[in-house]
Amino acid sequence: LSEKKKKSSVDVVIVESPAKARTIKRILGSAFSVRASLGHIRDLPEKSLGVEVEKDFKPTYKVLPGRQKTVRMLKEAVQEANNIYLATDLDREGEAIAWHLKQALGLRDEKTWRVIFNEITQRSIKAAFARPGKIDMNKVDAQTARRILDRLVGYMLSPLLWKKVARGLSAGRVQSVAVRMVVEREKEIKDFVPEEFWKITATLAPKKGDADAGKEFLAQLVQKEGAEFKPKNEAEAQSCVQELEKEEFRIASFEEKETTQYAPPPFTTSRMQQTASGRFGFSPRKTMQIAQRLYEGLSLGKKGRVGLITYMRTDAVRVSSAALNQVRRLIKDKFGEQYLPEKPHFFKARGRIQAAHEAIRPTSVARQPEEIKAHLSPDQFKLYDLIWKCFVASQMKPVELLEQTAQIEAGKYTFLAKGRKILFPGHSLVSGWGLKKDEQNLPKLRPDQILDLLGLEPTQHFTQPPPRYSVASLIRALEQKGIGRPSTYAPIISTIQERGYVRLQRRLFYATEVGTIVTEKLIRHFPDIMDVDFTSQMEEGLDDVEEAKTDWLNILRKFYEPFKRALEAAEEQMISVKDEAAEVEQLCPKCGSPMVSKMSRYGRFLACSAFPKCKYTETLTKKEEIAGDRKCPKCEASLVVKSGPYGKFLGCSAYPKCDYKESLQAKRRKKRPSGAPQTRSGLKRKKVAEPTDIDCPAGCGGKLIRRRGPRGYFYGCSNFPHCKYTSKSLPTPGQSESDS
């Protein structure tokens, strides 16, 4: 009996995911039982506030739907355990998950340990388990405060928007500020008045007999009579050209100086997301899903499961001394000693960084991308290759450049020519950094040298409005303004799109009408919540809680009272969009009453003013989008051209009440004349694959595709054959690999 008890008493380790569990189990061996919680197991209730404001913001937590079985299995697993190790992620969210596990499972403090590590490698895991600690309640309190703040804003503001704007809308403490940034940029672009200006480019070359004779280069007109000058119109530009054609072009000054171009630091979360978006078109969510898999571990054949990168939610740029030594050895061996700096490069972090965090880097730089490519999906390889190259380049010698500047005088006009050339490639061998296509290398010039004028080209230009935010530039702006943290950038970008407040078109953000209306009303009635600086200060306050500089209740009290007053005032003073409904020059086709413009969560639509007697509605659509005089065969409303994830199609203007739609291509295809032979191009092709927007539950970064097999339809991963996930039915969002 004692032997049986001894056998059943093991140490239990709890992590978030099955993939992470498998990698850690391989390292720890049979002495440990490693279990997965499948992420969060408890949260505030869905259908109530879940916060007792009058009792010091006491939260009420409920086990999440579908997680009862997980909790029951974990309770059974820890019942006879000698020790329980909570090995969730090392950030605030991971600490909160560990605390919730301890509470939900009723774990005794003397048997419960917290282990944290930055990478899932044998060295790191062994070190973490050799010195376990206790749950950091400062981190837990900071995460609790964030969750309650977000719940207060979302749960209390959303009903106001339903009442004043449209049902189904929602507001968020951080997301609403991000939407504001897009809306304000939209207004700047709309209000921008372009101004015409002209550039004059001279093509010049040293004269015969001079060094580099005949080597052409370009110079731009920059000054007239010592003052900055750009012609305002074509007439002024042509007048300048006529004057310049008579002038002698002389070198006033020529300078050459050597400069260096250092590689940027290894990746933080935000820079990884920005670079992956710009380079591969990955959404922040997709980037983080792929990075999660690389961190938790992948099978490398005979080498087994290996964690390939360090923890991917970080704003730190520091690197461990062991990793620095390893990368310096690789640079010396692979590229030569001339590419290795005398001392390692150390980078200064922005803001407040946790000491335990590192930059995102490979767990072993010796594991070169091409060597493990066969074991990775295409997207996993892209991201790993990006991380590996960024880390290696950051510790290589800089690119050495020769910068050239020539100032050229032509009568009362001054031209400027700039050039650069690479003297030593440095990190560019890895980073791929290079000169821009339009950069030139100037010939050898000297002061007072007379040049040959080979041509003058005036070109028309217009001042440009501020650029629209891309995914990368919006994340960069959020980070620079102190809004959000590494774990929140991806959810922010996803949420503002899912709510319909912004849309992403050709990788650029556009504010929707609903987003603009909601933003304007929130700015007017909740200036603090919508203020960028206020939101940044709240983030700093949460950092203070984590660092034990303030109590989490102080943060909540400071926020809640002004928010409550603003909410009460808005209930009375905010004008309902329903009261702003305006008649349009159109009569209801059903009853002849005037139509009015109204607002829903999807945007404006037309409705009959005789509602509720007449319930006719129609999508408010631009005239050019109407599909001629075609009517819906189901309800007689107009058919309009709409855009979906797979292109344009015809849909009913009365959507969502009428869901009729048809292929636009089918209507555009020419009819085959009667009796004409059937051509190959006219044959109907069998549809064998149908993409979806559902992420692969295996976490490989792919999307699910509906395919047809010998036994009927099934769902498979777009990364096949690297990912072999399949399912008979479409999984629900958030389903894990182990659920399938």
Predicted regions located by residue number:
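Conserved short loop/turn motifs at secondary-structure junctions
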Residues: 9, 89-90, 166-170, 256-265, ...
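Intrinsically disordered, low-complexity regulatory segments
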Residues: 1-147, 156, 235-238, 347, ...
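Short, hydrophobic-biased segments on the C-terminal half of alpha helices
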Residues: 288-292, 493-494
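Short acidic, hydrophobic short linear motifs in intrinsically disordered regions
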Residues: 251-254, 263-276, 303-311, 465-477
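Metal- or metallocofactor-binding catalytic centers and their adjacent structured scaffolds
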Residues: 230-265, 449
